[in-house]
Amino acid sequence: MLRFATAVLVAASFAAPAAAQVQRAFPQNALRGAIVIGVAPDIQLNGRPARLAPGSRIRDTNNMAVVPSGLTGGRYLVNYTVDTYGLVKDVWILRPEEAAVRPWPTTPNEAQAWQFDPAGQVWIKP
């Protein structure tokens, strides 16, 4: 019985770190904004009308893919990318610790002027 209890404790010590959330790596072209999802593909991005691209991906706080209809009407702080046609392509709903990372560009002009550290997932203003 003692060996079994020891084995369970050892196994639990390895399983605990696996349950921790992994830091997500956002691409350099990801911008930050507030999104309100209406009837897909229509959304409000930073208070302005926008559209989701065909095949767009929305990731929740657990990095799981979600469909826009499950998020209708909610307001979320997100990082997002835009395709060449100006449509919103990828959306990541931010966890509180990700939202606390500042500064993060909200416009393409800011992203071009600042420097991005992909390893640390931080932006550096000049």
Feature names for model-found ranges:
Residues 50-66:
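Beta-strand/loop nucleic-acid-binding surfaces
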Residues 9-17:
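Hydrophobic core
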Residues 2-5, 17-44, 64-126:
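Short, flexible, surface-exposed loop segments at domain boundaries
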